Amino acid sequence: MINETRTTLDQSEVDHFSRIAAEWWNPHGKFRPLHQFNPTRLAYIREKICLELHRDPVSLKPFENLKILDIGCGGGLLCEPMARLGAMVVGADASQTNIEVAKIHAAQNGLSIDYRTTTAEALATEGEQFDIILNMEVVEHVADVNLFIEATAKMLKPQGLMFISTLNRTWKAWGLAIIGAEYILRWLPKGTHNYKKFLKPRELKNLLLQNALTVVDEIGVTYNPLNDSWNRSKDMNVNYLLLAKKS
C-alpha cells in the first residue's frame, strides 16, 4: 500500500517546467533536444510494443485497444503519436500549465487524449490499470524515485510493459547533460537537471525488481554532432532506456 504521507512531487521541478511550458511544441525552442530525441525513442517504443505484444508493425494503428499512460507527459510530445497509432492515451503531469498546453495542442490536431493534472501516487490510488506505461525523462525530476516506481508499477497490468528513459549518474553525463547542454551550448535552461537525481542502470533495475518488473531490454541513446541527430547505441553512460515487463 502506498504511504499517503510521501510524495513524488518536487515543486521546484514543477515550477521550472511550468515557466517554459509555452515552448513545448516549438522544435527550435527550449525543448529542441527533446524534439530531436523523440523520433529515436518513438521508433524504439513502437518496435518493442509490436514485438512483445504481437502487434502488426506495418499496421497504421498497431496500438489499437491498448491503454497507455504517459506519466510526466509535459506538453504531450509522446502522447500524440501514441494516440495516432491507435492507443487509448492518458497523459499525466503535475504541472497544470503543461497539461493546458497539451490539451490545446491535441484539440488543434483533432486528437482525443485524456490529460490529467496529477501525480503518480495520486493516480495509483484510483485503481486504473494500463497495458503500457511510459516513464520518459521523468525519474530524474521526482522527489521520491522509490515511491514513483512503486506507484507506476502498481498501475501496470500483469505482462504489461514499462519504458523508462533517463540519465546515468556518471561524470560523462554530468559533463554532457549539465555542463555541456545547459551551460555551454545553452540547449536547455540552467537548472533543468540535478546530478544527484541521476540513476545508474543497476539502481533502476533493482527498484524495478522490487516491484515485480524485470528488465527485458536496454539501450543507450547517443548524440552525433556531425549530423545533429540522436541514435541508439550500446553506450549507456549518458542517456539510456530500459524496457521492463511485469510478472
Curated annotation (Swiss-Prot):
InterPro entries, per the entry: SAM-dependent_MTases_sf, UbiG_MeTrfase
Pathway: Cofactor biosynthesis; ubiquinone biosynthesis
Pfam families noted in UniProt: Methyltransf_23 (PF13489)
GO biological process: methylation
One example GO MF annotation: 2-polyprenyl-6-hydroxyphenol methylase activity
Entry binding sites for S-adenosyl-L-methionine: R41, G72, D93, M136
Reactions accelerated catalytically: a 3-demethylubiquinol + S-adenosyl-L-methionine = a ubiquinol + S-adenosyl-L-homocysteine + H(+); a 3-(all-trans-polyprenyl)benzene-1,2-diol + S-adenosyl-L-methionine = a 2-methoxy-6-(all-trans-polyprenyl)phenol + S-adenosyl-L-homocysteine + H(+)
Protein family per UniProt: Belongs to the methyltransferase superfamily. UbiG/COQ3 family.
Protein name as annotated: Ubiquinone biosynthesis O-methyltransferase
Protein species of origin: Bartonella henselae (strain ATCC 49882 / DSM 28221 / CCUG 30454 / Houston 1) (Rochalimaea henselae)
